Amino acid sequence: MTFPSHNPPETGHPSAAPDEALPAAEAPVPGDPEARFSSRSIRSFVLRQGRMSVAQQRHLDETLPKVGIPYRVAPLDLDAAFGRAAPKIVEIGFGMGETTAKIAAALPDKDFLTIEVHGPGVGSLCKLIAEGVLDNVRIVQHDAVEVLRDMIPERALAGVHVFFPDPWHKKRHHKRRIIQPDFVALIASRLAPGAYLHCATDWEEYAQWMLEVLAAEPALENTADGYAPRPAYRPLTKFENRGLKLGHGVWDLVFRRRG
């Protein structure tokens, strides 16, 4: 099976496709730098030459060794990784980490295994972890599909978050979307019975795509009649607030693993 991969660093808006013109600061890194984070040929993340701040680099150097978990092809002992037994939630593609840090701070009784490839975003979340003294967040800087496939045991998770993934809005790029039948089946296999998968997007056509794909997965059931109200634990992003004021929509989908 082939899976597309997870979202690029900027969440909440469509990203430019790889073949579109981009500003110099956002141009794709020459060569194939994504190969460091994924062995798969179809990926939905594209590494950009983003600017790394001094603070982000410092926390990559100082904080990531404390909270980072290297990718490996071996099951991860999740309780050992966090030093306790607690519900484990995977967050796929956390952007710059603001939402992740807020959720983790609000839910200290849960542990969050977060996955992102973008260096400045990883550095930003590391900074927020250090500033907030968040003991319940760990980071894997790698392709989310490979992390779930190779490191997460079956029925081990209490939840999975996929917030504002790249919609890859051009039809020829739909194969790069992270929400695909095979990947949803993989996620479902990692959820414990009764655990949830929560997706959110501000791209209406992608919301419809997500709803169709999730509804077709036999191991999952919708918790709502179509789209779900935004759960209280998911804070509004700055981009989302601006969009709502302009009348733009945001769609949440919350599905539960059948027993």
UniProtKB/Swiss-Prot annotation:
Domain of life, per lineage: Bacteria
EC number: 2.1.1.33
Record keyword NAD present: no
Underlying gene: trmB
Keywords in alphabetical order: Methyltransferase, S-adenosyl-L-methionine, Transferase, tRNA processing
Bias type Low complexity, positions: 14-29
Family: Belongs to the class I-like SAM-binding methyltransferase superfamily. TrmB family.
Annotated protein name in UniProt: tRNA (guanine-N(7)-)-methyltransferase
Binding site for S-adenosyl-L-methionine: E91, E116, D143, D166
Pfam families: Methyltransf_4
